[in-house]
Amino acid sequence: MNKIVHKVAEAFRKNGVPRTKWLNPKTIYGLANQKLLGSVEAPHAQGTGLNTVPQVEHYTKACRTKQRDMVRSYLEATGSTHFARLNTPAYNKSSALEFYAKLKALQRYTEGEEVLFQMSSVEVREIISRLVKLTQEGDQIPDEQRRFPTELFMDVAPVPNFNDDPGILEQYIGILTHSAFYYHNTSKIDPIPHILRDLLHPQNEKTASLRTTTMFNDLIYYFGKKSDYASCREYYSQMKLEKKTPNIETYRLLFLNLLKNMQIPKKQLPYKEMIFYLNDMEKFGVPADAKIWAYCYHLLVESVSKKLLLEKMIQHNAPISPDFIVSILRTLDVDCKAILEFAKEYSIPFTPKLLRLCISKLCKEYKFESAWQLLTSLCRSTDVVTTGSVNILLNAAAEKGRLDLAVLTYNSMKVQLGVTPDLRTHRLIFKAMARNGYHENFQDVYHWAVWSMKRSTSGWFVHDAWSRRCESMIKQKCGSVTPPTTENMEKVAAILHRGVWDNRGLFIRCWGEYKELRHVFRLLGSIPPAYKGKTA
């Protein structure tokens, strides 16, 4: 690892982080090698003009035109003429692609990066100077403590009767923007953008006095997830037009959207937009926190500017978060052991992002045993083990077609890790099935996977490409999918639920290590070639 990364980590260590727990990398490798929805369910919305959820429709060319017209009328209602999409110039795609290709070519070479720095050094220095000016001493700004369910298996609820209470409206908008709704019409147009645009429409007098900065932040977050960055900028402008003061969360989201938008070919660097937002932060008295510094670092397009920013960060005692150090480590070509030793040396606490990075590294090294040992070591005393980190291991097993590893990890994540599977977890089981291939018990395992998903999704079965591939494999071999009997389903479930990792941990060669579970592996069709056709 280069010197500047060590300097950043040393600066972080000087600040001190209480209640930090460390793991010995040698131990990990050694052991391994050996009430929120209450208001949403209101049946009717009164006095809003949105009593029902709009009819969904197929996403056709006519529908795209309708969407553009809706956005145009929305912007015209603000009374402002500075919105770009009110007078959209022709997008010069070839020019953007040419600039993007030249930028990528320059980034490949040291000489090219120096050229990029010379081209943009004035803007880079202005960005850094404004960051330094906006940085306040003392404690870091805490994140907003708002909790929403990530997945909801229900139809989108109608707008509740908020009765001039911004709290109810704010909660409803928060759920729509932060929760993924899975309903019967998932192949049709999502009605949520229509509802959100109507609720915050400039001419909607019933919600005008109830709108808050948090509501606009939620919409910026939502449309940022959908990569609709133009809408994000427009809601930021509307927020200012309606005299709602932006806060630190607003600018975190805007800088994050800038970072995600860099993946799309552009005709210019993002520096002018960065300076614009930093100027607005100064205007509204919003300080720059650790996340703003981190986003600015990643928005810089070459290493000279990044090194300069890190040096100023250390020099002026700017806030440094553990996740920022993790994001730098993610760009380096180092293995998991080096990351663990680095984290221990500089007292970097284990966070969910650091854990996901370590699990990803271990899976790329095909060290599934080490990954499972790391998960079990952390789950007993910390809350950093999440469904997302387990899904990384599950995905690695599914990529290899190891249905045996996937199913035993799926069963064990609930029992040993105390982690609840999500929709992606179940979809990875179907992926492992499809990659594993068809066998005589394939249909039984398929019905078990469907049954397991329904237990976690309120009885809904949400198809994806992998479940449909499994279904087509059954139809190709059997002609149709035969509905399971209750007796057979209970028998299959009883057998498969016995498959869990015990104190021995995960083993890639589980057929030899877990001989008592060979009946489970046979049911899954995960039999080593040397044992196929044998009874042992």
From Swiss-Prot:
The keyword Protein transport does not apply. Keywords: Membrane, Mitochondrion, Mitochondrion inner membrane, Repeat. GO terms for cellular component: mitochondrial inner membrane. It is found in: Mitochondrion inner membrane. PPR repeats lie at residues 212-246, 386-421. It comes from the Eukaryota. InterPro entries: TPR-like_helical_dom_sf. It is a peripheral membrane protein. The keyword Repeat applies. Its main location: mitochondrion. PANTHER family: PENTATRICOPEPTIDE REPEAT-CONTAINING PROTEIN 4, MITOCHONDRIAL-RELATED, RESPIRATORY COMPLEX I CHAPERONE (CIA84), PUTATIVE (AFU_ORTHOLOGUE AFUA_2G06020)-RELATED. Required for respiration. This is ATPase expression protein 3. The lineage of its organism: Eukaryota, Fungi, Dikarya, Ascomycota, Saccharomycotina. The gene is AEP3.
